[in-house]
Every structure is written in C-alpha cells, then in structure tokens.
Swiss-Prot record:
The modification Phosphothreonine is found at T38. This is Quinidine resistance protein 2. It is found in: Cell membrane. Coiled coil: none annotated. Keywords: Cell membrane, Ion transport, Membrane, Phosphoprotein, Potassium, Potassium transport, Transmembrane, Transmembrane helix, Transport. It is a multi-pass membrane protein. One of its GO terms (cellular component) is plasma membrane. The chain crosses the membrane at residues 68-88, 101-121, 128-148, 150-170, 188-208, 217-237, 301-321, 334-354, 414-434, 438-458, 473-493, 504-524. The modification Phosphoserine is found at S21, S40. GO terms for molecular function: monoatomic cation transmembrane transporter activity; threonine efflux transmembrane transporter activity; transmembrane transporter activity; xenobiotic transmembrane transporter activity. PROSITE patterns: MFS. Its main location: membrane.
C-alpha cells in the first residue's frame, strides 16, 4: 500500500516541487552511497522528457492577447454600464433601487454561469465553450441595443452575463494548461491585468459613447467588438486542454477543437504537430455538473473564496456608488462621471500586473529556500534509516510537513493589501459623505483600488495550482463567490446608504473584509496539510 500511495501522490501537481528536488540529490550523499556498492552498474541512456508545453514564448504571448481580448468583453460589460445608470433611470421612469437591479442580475448570472460552464470546458475543451460564449454575448448585446422596456433590459442583461462570464474562468484554465507553476503567476497576472482594462476604462468608454450617441451606443459597441473577438478566436485560439491536445503537439480529434491557424507550416513545425508527444495526453475528464459543489466542500477553498469574494464585492460596490454619488451629489455630467473612473481603473491595472510579477519572484524565492531545507532533512533521514533511499523517499512523499507550502508562496502579502484597501475604501466613503473635494474622493478611490485587486491575482493563481485538471471549474467557483456577494451588496446599497450614509456603508464593508482576512492565517499555517489530506481522500489513498 505504501508503494501505491507514493506513485499516486507523485502524480499530483501539488507535489511538483517535491519531485523536482528529489531529482537533484545531495552530492555528498551520493558519494557515500557509491562507496557501498560492490558492483559496477552500466549507466542507462538518458531519456529526455517532452516539454510541459510546446507553445513557444511568442505563441504564449499571442494566447495572452487573445484571452485578454475575450475577457475584456466580460469585464467591460459591467463597467461600461455604470455612467448611464441615471440615464436608464430617467429613460424607463424607474427609481434608483430598480436601476440597481439591472446591475445585480448581471452579477448573479456572472457568478452562476461559469460555475457550470467550467465543467464543460474541463471535459469538452476550452475552445468550443469560448466560441459559444461569445456568440451568446453577441446576440444579447444586439438585443440590449434594441430594447424598448425595462423588463427586456433585465432579461437580456441576464443573458449577456451568462454568455460571456465563463471566459474569465476558461482563461485561467488556458493559462494553467500551458504554463508551469514557476511562471504561472506572471502569466495569470498579465491576462488578469489586460482583462481588467474593461473595468479600468469601461466607464470612460461608456460615458464617451452615451454622451455622443446615447445609451444604446454602448451595446452596439459591445456587439461590434464581440463580433470581431469571435472571428479572432475562431481563427487563432488553439485547444489547450491537456486531455485533448497534450502539451500542444497533439492534433485534436474533433474539428470543433481545431483552430485554422494550425494548418500553417510554421505553426505545425513550432508545435511538433507532425511528431506529437502522445505521452503528455492526460486522462479524459468526465463531465460532472456537480463538480463545483465537491470543490466547495474543501475547507481551505471556502476560506480563500470568502476572503477574495468580500474584497471583490467591496470593490464593485464602490464602483456602483461612485456613479450615483458623482451624478447626484457632485452634479457631474455623464462624460465627467466616466473620467472620474480613471484613477480606480489605472490603479487596478497596475496592481494586478505588479501582483503577478511579485508572485513569480516570491515563488522562486520560497522554492529555493524549500529545496535547501528539504536537502538537509533528506540527509538527516538517510542517516537515520541506513541510507535506504526508497524508504526515505516514501517518508517524504507521504508526510505533509515535507511538502512545499504553495499557500505561503501565493498568499503571503495578501493580509497587508487587504488592510490597505479596506482603509482606503473607508476613507472614500467618508469623503463622499462629508462632500469633500472631488480630488480627495478620486484619490481614495485610486488608492483603495491599487491594493484591492491584488487578492484577485493571488487567489486565482493559487486555485489553478491546487486544481490543475479542473482549473475552469475551480475558477468558476471563485467567480461564483465574488459575484454573488457583489450582487447582495449592490442590491442592498441604496437602502444601506439611506440608513448609514456612504461613510457608514464602507466602514461596515471595510471592517467585514478586514476581519475576514484574519482567516488567511489559517491557510498560511494549515493550508498545505488540508490540501494534502483532501488530495489523498480524492484519490482514495489511506
């Protein structure tokens, strides 16, 4: 049973670093073991394993651009709508609470759709689900541009969110397919950073379009843009799911999973399509619509999703409140309201990109420390067990205290960033309440946003690390928490502002988020043991 346990656990992506370090044995120990041998063993020829991914650095750059372009239309659909909330309110003769419902339903379906569509992406492949998602979104945008009643707006906003929202989770899956853990933080950060351009500049774009051509122009813009995005995805987005295309060198059997770009000779040569690495194909993932609920059973995952979800909810609530406050308290035009979203947007973009680069640096630093520590522990165990290499290897592989702490590598700075963003949002709320100069409101909005979305990169990268074969499903669960909590707070925003004013609302949200961040200490101390135990239970290993 011990041997079987070792072979199974070794296959877990969570143990990648352990496998790496086991390959580089201490030179002194190797010399000692060599002295005990009495027979000369002829060395076997070295077999070079195929690379984790055949996608070149330049091709990965293309993937980043395409994923970000697709994800852009998911993030912008929410932000581009904020400047016209007051316009929609007047157009359909509804109150502030009802116009906020159009934002709430968008977040609800933005959370629900990826939770289930992620399973299709993990089993049927990334490419088909992305193409279907864009088509649904394209149709919904045309419908919204032609909508004549409030009810039509509500229904089509639901369809719009359900259509495009899965691509955010699928993009994380694509990055997980083509990257190693050492480089993943940077790539996830870049994709998330460019995706968030929609949130960063969506309000500005929406304000410009609506002030010039009316509120319907924003949906025509989204329809035209998503149509172009569909053509680009259809032509160049390859299938990356490893049970379908391996490391990228295996041509998918289904034509739905084949990108036309693969017929180009340079691409075929680069990906080794004529000499595929079949050994990199993973076992097929069965479609299981209940898989998200199994992921949510994990204690450590629920903690991570709660903390990240509350932070994201506070960020989106601040964006919604900003539109209302600027138009009603500062009496700004739609175009000026859009400009006021720039500080938040630019700081959000900077924070996500910098957070991704930090993750790569911190991962390398902690991995180097871990390998040195493990080398010393291995040498000590060899002395205690008469240089029995196999026994020592089994001990290390089956004791969680010897595993690399991926939670520390990904979440170490999160507590500080959460406290800073919560403080910034609290100050932002009180600036609006006391009608401070507009510059003060925008400075606090930018400061809070600079630290707010770091947790997005930290949590997404960690989720991809923990669920390498179910990345879209797992990221969809994270998205569910974020969007449902956002919907709850935005739905209650107008009532809360009536009772507590903006200052009280954001003080409450800041206190809630800061308090929840304390739970991260559980993950830093016990996360790797919880994940190790969960993985063994999933594999049926005692």
């Amino acid at each position: 049973m011990a041997g079987a346990t070792s072979s199974i656990i070794r296959e877990n992506d969570f143990e990648d670093e352990l496998a790496e370090s086991m390959q580089s044995y201490n030179r002194e120990t190797a010399d000692k073991l060599a002295l005990t041998r009495t027979e000369s063993v002829k060395p076997e020829p070295e077999i070079t394993a195929p690379p984790h991914s055949r996608f070149s650095r330049s091709f990965k750059t293309v993937l980043i651009a395409q994923c970000a372009f697709t994800g852009f239309f998911s993030t912008i659909a929410g932000a581009i709508y904020y400047p016209v909330l007051s316009v929609i309110e007047r157009k359909f003769d509804i109150d502030e609470e009802l116009v906020n419902v159009t934002v709430v339903v968008y977040f609800v379906f933005q959370g629900l759709a990826p939770t289930f569509m992620g399973g299709f992406a993990d089993s049927l492949g990334r490419r088909p689900v992305v193409l279907v998602a864009i088509v649904i979104y394209f149709g919904a945008c045309i419908g919204l541009a032609c909508a004549q009643t409030y009810a039509q707006i509500i229904v089509l906003r639901c369809l719009q969110a359900a259509g495009i929202s899965p691509v955010i989770a699928i993009n994380s899956g694509i990055m997980g397919d083509v990257t190693t853990r050492a480089e993943r933080g940077g790539y996830v950060g870049y994709v998330a950073g460019f995706q968030v351009l929609g949130s960063a500049f969506g309000a500005l774009i929406g304000a410009g379009l609506s002030s010039r051509w009316g509120w319907r122009a924003i949906f025509w813009f989204l329809a035209i843009g998503s149509g172009i995005c569909f053509l680009a995805s259809f032509l160049i987005l390859p299938e990356t799911k490893r049970n379908i295309s391996g490391n990228g060198s295996v041509t998918p059997k289904s034509y739905l999973n084949r990108a036309p770009i693969l017929v180009l000779p340079t691409v075929r040569k680069s990906l080794h399509l004529d000499n595929p690495d079949y050994e990199t194909l993973e076992l097929p993932t069965q479609l299981n619509l209940l898989a998200p609920f199994k992921i949510l059973k994990a204690y450590e995952i629920c903690i991570l999703m709660l903390v990240a979800g509350l932070q994201f909810a506070m960020y989106t609530t601040h964006l919604t409140a900003l539109s209302t406050a600027l138009s009603k308290q500062y009496h700004l035009t739609v175009a000026k309201v859009g400009l006021c979203y720039l500080p938040s947007g630019i700081c959000t973009l900077c924070s996500i990109v910098i957070a991704g680069r930090y993750l790569n640096w911190n991962y390398r630093r902690r991995l180097k420390y871990y390998q040195n520590w493990l080398g010393k522990k291995r040498s000590k165990l060899l002395e205690e067990h008469d240089n029995d290499l196999n026994l020592v290897q089994r001990i290390i592989e089956n004791d969680p205290k010897y595993t690399f702490n991926i939670f520390k590598a990904r979440l170490q700075p999160a507590f500080v960033t959460l406290l800073l963003s919560s403080s910034g949002f609290c100050a932002y709320g009180w600036c609006i309440t006391v009608k401070a100069p507009l510059a003060a409101v925008l400075c606090m909005s930018g400061f809070a946003s600079l630290f707010s979305n770091c947790i997005l990169t930290f949590s997404t990268t960690l989720i991809v690390d923990l669920f390498p074969t179910k990345t879209s499903t797992a990221t969809g669960c994270l998205n569910l928490f974020r969007c449902i909590l956002s919907a709850v707070f935005i739905a209650a925003l107008s009532k809360m502002v009536e009772k507590m004013k903006f200052g009280g609302v954001f003080t409450f949200l800041g206190a809630l988020t800061s308090s929840s961040s304390i739970l991260l200490f559980i993950l830093l101390r016990k996360g790797k043991e919880l994940a190790f135990k969960r993985k063994k239970q999933e594999l049926g290993v005692n």
